[in-house]
A protein has these predicted regions:
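Membrane-embedded helix-loop-helix hairpins and adjacent transmembrane boundary segments
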Residues: 1-495
Length: 495
């Protein structure tokens, strides 16, 4: 496809998003922006959350995992399913009972202001870093595919991307996101489905035949129990997947804000249960595509792409979609799917960051009624500017530095996990002023634990490869730290 054609495609896509914004954002109130007036259809929220769960990185990378891991990623997905059940049974009833706008308001009720601010601050850091990282990767891809050849600087690409997101989230907020997420989920699934159909046609296979082919079986092993030191060992993936979901969905304002738009806890639970089933199915589809991509590449002698001399399996999907003669239809759906995957996570991040900062730090609900909407709009602009600056900073750093920053940001979910676990599982109160210190110490200790195999290979950890299980370890260290600074008396709050 020519760059001008891709730009036209992007323009049409955003016109549709802005039209949805116009139709859903007419009310332009804080209640609609933050909670969608608690009137969102639960089934729509469930379907749209699939798109929000699959970032642009996931859209490209999950199919690429098949080469080194086969279907091992599904072990983690099964953990996700269990994690969603825990969120459904424990956290959703709690949030609805407290009637919170920001889920971190629970921490103030349970422990005090320092714990509240600590939890909200760690969410802001992790979500700003995570959203910026994902936007950076997709903006980089779009710069390479389209804008570089037109002489458009990278910073312009970034500013335009975030400006477009600001335009369609400015009025409706989460009420708009519910509908745009649905559209973006459809776009992603269409892209993957078209790719599977076209590859099967080229291979002259039916879908039923695919699962009986030896070449497919050799790329689709799911369970790995052989090597406990391996990063794809079953219990690492499965247990890690449970805690990833609890922390990065149940304790994340971005993800939970959508669940809190449902009319009541019962409907929100139905939404979460349906979404957990759909997510398993969607990940099976993505991994199936991954296996077919590598089979197709082997059969037609397509080299796996390299970037800076490094083989990049996660670039095989865009390479085949854009350059390997499967037709303009696949190229079009791939571009739309990539844009949808990127912006479905970025737009909800912008909305949730605006919500968290407005509620948790500006205390918007305590402001005069006339000042509330202007304050929210100022915060929305401010968050947009922060995202632009961080993405541009990422572009000036070396790739390894950016990756390590993103990895370190994921450690901030450990203190959230520990804080909420301590609040829900115990009746103890803490010396609230020490919470921030406990959280920072937990992050640093966890980080040093992950470095142990590299710097101290003869230690008791040896050659152990840490994976997702580092999150519950981080949470456990936080839990122990809170226990050490807890008071003897019990809280009167029913938690």
């Amino acid at each position: 496809m020519q760059p001008t054609q891709i730009i036209l495609l992007i323009a049409v896509y955003f016109v549709v998003l802005i039209l949805i914004s116009y139709l859903t954002g007419k009310e332009d109130s804080n209640e609609a922006f933050f909670k969608a007036n608690k009137s969102a259809p639960w089934y729509l929220v469930a379907f749209g959350m699939i798109g929000a769960s699959l970032s642009g990185v996931t859209f490209i990378s999950v199919p690429g995992l098949v080469e080194g891991q086969q279907f091992a990623y599904l072990q983690g997905v099964l953990g996700f399913f269990v994690g969603y059940l825990i969120v459904l049974l424990v956290l959703i009833p709690l949030y609805y009972q407290l009637n919170v706008t920001s889920i971190y308001q629970y921490l103030e009720d349970r422990f005090g202001k320092t714990s509240y601010k600590t939890g909200a601050f760690f969410f802001l850091i992790s979500r700003v870093t995570g959203a910026s990282f994902r936007l950076y990767l997709v903006a980089l891809a779009m710069q390479y595919i389209v804008f570089e050849s037109l002489g458009i600087p990278f910073w312009v690409t970034v500013v335009l991307s975030i400006l477009l997101i600001w335009l369609y989230t400015n009025k409706g907020g989460i009420k708009t996101i519910i509908w745009t997420d649905t559209l973006q989920t459809i776009a992603m699934l269409t892209s993957v489905s078209v790719a599977i159909i076209l590859i099967l046609n080229k291979l002259d296979w039916t879908l039923a035949e695919t699962f009986t082919k030896e070449t497919f079986k050799n790329k689709s092993k799911i369970f790995f129990f052989e090597d406990v030191n391996s990063s794809i060992y079953f219990w690492k993936y499965f247990i890690g997947g449970i805690f990833i979901t609890i922390a990065m969905t149940g304790l994340d304002q971005d993800m939970m804000q959508k669940n809190l738009t449902c009319k009541n806890a019962k409907e929100s639970k139905k939404n979460m249960f349906l979404m957990s089933i759909l997510l398993v199915v969607v990940n099976v589809i993505f991994l199936t595509l991954g296996a077919l991509l590598f089979i197709y590449a082997e059969q037609f002698n397509i080299a796996i792409p390299e970037l800076n001399g490094v083989t990049r399996t996660d670039l095989l999907f865009p390479e085949i979609a854009m350059n390997q003669g499967l037709g303009k239809g696949l190229a079009i759906t791939f571009i739309i799917g990539l844009i949808a995957a990127a912006y479905s996570s970025a737009d909800s991040a912008l909305t949730s960051l605006t919500t968290s900062f407005s509620v948790d730090f500006c205390h918007i609900e305590n402001q005069p009624i006339a000042a509330q909407k202007p304050l929210r709009k100022k915060v929305h602009v401010g968050v947009s500017i922060v995202l632009i600056v961080v993405v541009i900073i990422f572009n000036s750093l070396e790739g390894s530095v950016v990756s390590n920053l993103f990895k370190f940001a994921t450690f901030t979910y450990g203190p959230l996990l520990g804080l909420f676990a301590f609040g829900i599982l115990t009746k103890k109160t803490t010396h609230d002023k020490y919470t921030w210190m406990v959280a920072i110490i937990a992050i640093l200790l966890t980080y040093f634990i992950t470095l142990t195999p590299s710097y101290f290979p003869d230690s008791f950890i040896g050659n152990y490869n840490f994976h997702w299980e580092i999150l519950p370890i981080n949470g456990f260290i936080t839990f122990l730290g809170l226990l050490m600074v807890s008071k003897k008396q019990t809280t009167s709050i029913d938690s």
